[in-house]
Amino acid sequence: MESGGRPSLCQFILLGTTSVVTAALYSVYRQKARVSQELKGAKKVHLGEDLKSILSEAPGKCVPYAVIEGAVRSVKETLNSQFVENCKGVIQRLTLQEHKMVWNRTTHLWNDCSKIIHQRTNTVPFDLVPHEDGVDVAVRVLKPLDSVDLGLETVYEKFHPSIQSFTDVIGHYISGERPKGIQETEEMLKVGATLTGVGELVLDNNSVRLQPPKQGMQYYLSSQDFDSLLQRQESSVRLWKVLALVFGFATCATLFFILRKQYLQRQERLRLKQMQEEFQEHEAQLLSRAKPEDRESLKSACVVCLSSFKSCVFLECGHVCSCTECYRALPEPKKCPICRQAITRVIPLYNS
């Protein structure tokens, strides 16, 4: 706390930082809680022969936010894995990721770093069909890459380490980057895999479509069942809630500390002001009662004992209010009787 009771710059920065972090965490928590509530409110629809009749009776022949589960089936052609035999799917994602170590000039340590240098995703049209045989119904899945939880399975993964010569090693130390290698990954959504879709379910021209929902709700195509998906969202909500509460408590504690310091500083100023007024009032009463020839000596009297002459100048406040004996009798740490500031130096006052 600075002089005058004003908070210091560090306290302002701490309060501002915790407030901004708390607001950001609370915003994320609200967004996660909204997504969780929307998932809880999604209507579970059974993928069966009565699906079209259910949708035809729904307003606008659609369910705005529905949950449906089925097996993946390609419409026409399928995608073959480039590395695994007899592995067919409807979505294929190939990724090349570079791994390297970068020298940190601040910590003087080598830090692991990775970045995707190439990624390609191939898709073909596919449906969700019932697991049971003999049920003639299918749901066409539209825009699968727009989903926030695309349930791809890693079918191939290989790390290709970098081959380095002695001159390469020296060059890497000079440049501050040491390549470790390239990681090659293939992910696929296999034919026959179980998929849980959460989105807008629409009946259009006797065909059923699952597409991204409107009104800002999230689109899911997950390999997990709906209960596991909901549980994961609720766990995320609890985590962000705890983080928001922790930083909120830190913000409140910082604010309480600053306000308490200001309150104590204000109370101290009021007490010193009251003490000074009492000194002045007491001195005025003595002057009014004294004889004219004694008034000059009273004006120069020590405010503590009122018997000796003032003989000390207190620094840094500059008050002249005490005799030498009363100054010596002040308790440690010595403070000015008028303003209660710490006495750093005393200059003797010589009365003529």
From Swiss-Prot:
Result after altering H319A: Abolishes ligase activity. No effect on mitochondrial localization
GO cellular component, one term: peroxisome
Keyword Metal-binding annotated: yes
Domain of life: Eukaryota
Catalytic reactions of this protein: S-ubiquitinyl-[E2 ubiquitin-conjugating enzyme]-L-cysteine + [acceptor protein]-L-lysine = [E2 ubiquitin-conjugating enzyme]-L-cysteine + N(6)-ubiquitinyl-[acceptor protein]-L-lysine
Cytoplasmic side: 1-8, 260-352
Single Gene Ontology MF annotation: ubiquitin-protein transferase activity
Protein keywords: Apoptosis, Isopeptide bond, Membrane, Metal-binding, Mitochondrion, Mitochondrion outer membrane, Peroxisome, Transferase, Transmembrane, Transmembrane helix, Ubl conjugation, Ubl conjugation pathway, Zinc, Zinc-finger
Any Gene Ontology biological process: negative regulation of defense response to virus by host
Transmembrane segments: 9-29, 239-259
Zinc fingers classed as RING-type: ranges: 302-340
InterPro entries recorded: MDM2_MDM4_MUL1, MUL1-like, Znf_RING, Znf_RING/FYVE/PHD
Annotated metabolic or biological route of this protein: Protein modification; protein ubiquitination; Protein modification; protein sumoylation
Site of covalent link Glycyl lysine isopeptide (Lys-Gly) (interchain with G-Cter in ubiquitin): K52, K273, K299
PTM comment, free text: Ubiquitinated by PRKN during mitophagy, leading to its degradation and enhancement of mitophagy. Deubiquitinated by USP30.
Functional description taken from the UniProt entry: Exhibits weak E3 ubiquitin-protein ligase activity. E3 ubiquitin ligases accept ubiquitin from an E2 ubiquitin-conjugating enzyme in the form of a thioester and then directly transfer the ubiquitin to targeted substrates. Can ubiquitinate AKT1 preferentially at 'Lys-284' involving 'Lys-48'-linked polyubiquitination and seems to be involved in regulation of Akt signaling by targeting phosphorylated Akt to proteasomal degradation.
Domain notes: The zinc finger domain is required for E3 ligase activity.
Stated name of the protein: Mitochondrial ubiquitin ligase activator of NFKB 1
Species of provenance: Homo sapiens (Human)
